[in-house]
């Protein structure tokens, strides 16, 4: 009975973070749609660029979380499997993020976003941070730490939403009133960049909350890594 109770509790926590994430997406979409500074073309750009992020994130993680779950079940390989997965994803993510960052002046016009290189640089940051957190989050699930898993995900969502509201609603309102603290840095034409920046802050929050799980970064068991 205690096992079933624990399983039910974990399911609730994992489900809660997923449900809240979906709810927030439903909340943000109409906020973007009815915003006075996000027109239909910008909304299309936002949707398209986020689709790229979802696809590229697979490359950033190389599905190492699946390898970790497989080899982490072997008690003698638990720590080594985690360190291998963490170090691999960390290295690949930095490498790919740097490529996108420096190649942005060529990537942007090739995809129809000439002069908007900042979008791709911010997306590189989002994907890098999300990839960094993927293995630690997998470890939380592996260890049954559902509360910490849900807390991390919910803080990410909370920070993302707060900054979305700030950039999409508060800043344009203050900008229209010529508040100098806003007008000297805020540019409504780059609202998509601010939305991505909000996601960077959310992902950075997860990274900070999971920082203790990066202690094994750099430790590699090459023999086990070849199997993984």
Language-model-detected regions and their locations in the chain:
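Membrane-interface helix-loop junctions in multi-pass transport and translocation proteins
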Residues: 35-44, 143-151, 158-207
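Short membrane-interface helical motifs at transmembrane helix boundaries
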Residues: 34-35, 95-114, 171-183
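Signature of the first transmembrane helix
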Residues: 3-65, 93-104, 126, 161, ...
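Alpha-helical transmembrane segments of multi-pass membrane proteins
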Residues: 55-59, 94, 98, 112-136, ...
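Alpha-helical transmembrane segments of multi-pass membrane transporters/permeases
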Residues: 11-21, 79-83, 120-129, 140-168, ...
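Interhelical loop/hinge segments that connect adjacent transmembrane helices in multipass membrane
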Residues: 1-7, 175-194, 207-228
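Transmembrane-helix boundary and interhelical linker motifs in polytopic inner-membrane proteins
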Residues: 4-5, 33-43, 56-88, 135, ...
């Amino acid at each position: 009975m205690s096992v079933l109770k624990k399983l039910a509790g974990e399911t609730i926590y994992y489900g809660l973070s997923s449900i809240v994430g979906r709810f927030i997406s439903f909340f943000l979409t109409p906020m973007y749609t009815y915003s006075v500074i996000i027109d239909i073309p910008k909304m299309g750009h936002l949707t398209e660029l986020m689709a790229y992020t979802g696809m590229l994130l697979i490359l950033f993680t190389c599905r190492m979380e699946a390898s970790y779950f497989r080899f982490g079940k072997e008690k003698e390989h638990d720590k080594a499997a985690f360190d291998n997965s963490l170090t691999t994803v960390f290295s690949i993510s930095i490498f790919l993020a740097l490529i996108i960052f420096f190649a942005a002046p060529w990537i942007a016009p090739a995809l129809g976003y000439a002069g908007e290189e900042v979008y791709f640089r911010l997306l590189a940051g989002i994907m890098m941070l999300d990839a960094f957190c993927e293995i630690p989050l997998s470890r939380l699930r592996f260890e049954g730490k559902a509360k910490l898993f849900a807390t991390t995900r919910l803080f990410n969502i909370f920070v993302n939403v707060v900054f979305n509201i700030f950039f999409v609603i508060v800043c344009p309102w203050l900008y229209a009133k010529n508040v100098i603290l806003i007008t000297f840095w805020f540019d409504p034409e780059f609202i998509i960049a601010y939305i991505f920046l909000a996601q960077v802050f959310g992902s950075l929050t997860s990274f900070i909350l999971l920082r203790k799980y990066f202690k094994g970064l750099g430790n590699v068991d090459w023999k086990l890594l070849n199997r993984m």
